[in-house]
Amino acid sequence: MRNGAVQQMNSNPNASLYPWSQRRLTYTTSHPSPFPRYGAAVNSVASKEGDIYLMGGLINSSTVKGDLWLVEAGGNMACYPLATTAEGPGPRVGHASLLVGNAFIVYGGDTKMEDSDVLDETLYLLNTCMSLFIGVLG
């Protein structure tokens, strides 16, 4: 260990037990927080720029969302809705996502708003450089 690491552990003896840290997100005044949210899709590893994408989910135990948010974790922790140039996956809960290079991939989840609705089996790709969603039929 380096001297700085030893000093840090000495100042906080439980540092190795609690490796998590907290940072506040910053929102623009025109956009309220998207949290709390249940069943949203979030990339498990940030992009090389530190970007985290959050799509859809359930808020207030009753409203299913299909919105897309970006958290700039590599910078000032800005959090804001991301506009796309094509229609995205739409409202859903419990879907899966993966970030591969510049593609945020979304699949599945509960998309039924009415009992007669059919589940969406389309695989969606978001080109994160162009903010463009592309649907690939399954």
For each predicted feature, which ranges?
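Kelch-like beta-propeller repeat domains
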Residues: 1-138
